[in-house]
Each structure stands twice: as structure tokens, then as C-alpha cells.
From Swiss-Prot:
Gene: MAD2L2
Organism ancestry: Eukaryota, Metazoa, Chordata, Craniata, Vertebrata
Highest taxon above the source species: Eukaryota
Subunit and partners: Homooligomer. Heterodimer with REV3L. This dimer forms the minimal DNA polymerase zeta complex (Pol-zeta2), with REV3L bearing DNA polymerase catalytic activity, although its activity is very low in this context. Component of the tetrameric Pol-zeta complex (Pol-zeta4), which consists of REV3L, MAD2L2, POLD2 and POLD3; Pol-zeta4 is the fully active form of DNA polymerase zeta. Component of the shieldin complex, consisting of SHLD1, SHLD2, SHLD3 and MAD2L2/REV7.
Gene Ontology cellular component terms for the protein in this record: cytoplasm; nucleus; spindle; zeta DNA polymerase complex
Cellular compartments annotated: Nucleus; Cytoplasm, Cytoskeleton, Spindle; Cytoplasm
Protein's name according to its UniProt entry: Mitotic spindle assembly checkpoint protein MAD2B
């Protein structure tokens, strides 16, 4: 079977485009389903042939877009291990983490079913899982906020410094105390495997959210 490297056909860029589009939809939907923001700021749209809820709040949308704009060059270079949406309580302690573990193969097998043919269908299944995840999660306390964390491979440090200069959107090293949860409950939501991408989504949930 013929194989391509990540550089051929701008493979890394194609995967990064697909992932960033998906992550944008996923973040909006998580914020809606977990009621981080009032339902009134969301509008129903259609993505991946399923209904989703997308924010129409300009500042929130800009933050999400800026974040993913800076993540994209790291995805292109396969420097991202995890993208994590962290929901924080009023004391800025994490109550939930939606963890997207991302693995991209160094070589791409070429076949009639490879590249992007099945990826949209697989991503649709993730969106559907997020839509109903509140059935397996406890209610969050009122007044929650969120942040996005990116776990990178060690080699990504220099790339991130360059991106900060170019994008004018500073990355801040996360304080472990700010993002650590003691003995969280782990809830697997979805796993996908394709020729160009492997991804797993799970939630880490704090045991006692009201304390």
C-alpha cells in the first residue's frame, strides 16, 4: 500500500482545518449543554448535518476563534496531545474537564476510503454525544466560567513562542493547582479511529461540585 508523509498534499494543514472547525463547534455546544452561559445567547445551526447550538455573543466567539487560530499551527505540526475545555466554579476551581485526546499518524495510507471521506461522519457522532452528555453528568454550580487548555509535546515550546509573536494572543503556562482535580470521576464519551486521525473524548468530573 502506498503511503504519504505528513508533508505530502499539505496533510497537516488539512487535518488542522478539519480539527479546528470541529473543535469550534464542540466548544460552543459544551458551553450550551453545560449551561455555562444563558441559553439566550445561542442560536440553532446545522453542522455535520445535525442541529447544534452556536453562541452569537461577539466577545465569546472571538475568544474561541482566537484560541483555535493559535492552536491550528500546532496541530499542523502534530504538536498537540490534548485540547481541554475546563469549566470552573466561582472560586476558579475546575468542576469538569472535557478532554479531546488527539493522535495523528506520521504516515497516511492511501486507499479509496482514506483522507476525509469518513471523518465528517465520525465527528458527527462526537457532536451527538456532547449533545446528550448532561444525562451522565451532575449539575454544575451557578456562576461557572470556562477556559481552554492545550497540552503540547515538549518540542512545541518554540513553536508556541513564535505563534505568540505572530498572532498577538499570549499563551500562559497553566498552574497545576488551578487545573487539578482530586480523584475525579472519568466518563468516556466517544472514540474515533480513521486513517488520518484518532481522537478520544472523555470528561473528568469533580466528585463534589458544590464544595
Amino acid at each position: 500500500m502506498t503511503t504519504l508523509t505528513r508533508q505530502d498534499l499539505n496533510f497537516g494543514q488539512v487535518v488542522a482545518d478539519v480539527l479546528c472547525e470541529f473543535l469550534e463547534v464542540a466548544v460552543h455546544l459544551i458551553l450550551y449543554v453545560r449551561e455555562v452561559y444563558p441559553v439566550g445567547i445561542f442560536q440553532k445551526r446545522k453542522k455535520y448535518n445535525v442541529p447544534v447550538q452556536m453562541s452569537c455573543h461577539p466577545e465569546l466567539n472571538q475568544y474561541i476563534q482566537d484560541t483555535l487560530h493559535c492552536v491550528k499551527p500546532l496541530l499542523e505540526k502534530n504538536d498537540v496531545e490534548k485540547v481541554v475545555v475546563v469549566i470552573l466554579d466561582k472560586e476558579h476551581r475546575p468542576v469538569e474537564k472535557f478532554v479531546f485526546e488527539i493522535t495523528q499518524p506520521p504516515l497516511l495510507p492511501i486507499s479509496s476510503d482514506s483522507l476525509l471521506s469518513h471523518v465528517e461522519q465520525l465527528l458527527r457522532a462526537f457532536i451527538l454525544k456532547i449533545s446528550v452528555c448532561d444525562a451522565v453528568l451532575d449539575h454544575n454550580p451557578p456562576g461557572c466560567t470556562f477556559t481552554v487548555l492545550v497540552h503540547t509535546r515538549e518540542a512545541a515550546t518554540r513553536n508556541m513562542e513564535k505563534i505568540q509573536v505572530i498572532k498577538d494572543f499570549p499563551w500562559i503556562l497553566a498552574d497545576e493547582q488551578d487545573v487539578h482535580m482530586h480523584d475525579p470521576r472519568l466518563i468516556p464519551l466517544k472514540t474515533m479511529t480513521s486513517d488520518i486521525l484518532k481522537m478520544q473524548l472523555y470528561v473528568e468530573e469533580r466528585a463534589h461540585k458544590s464544595s
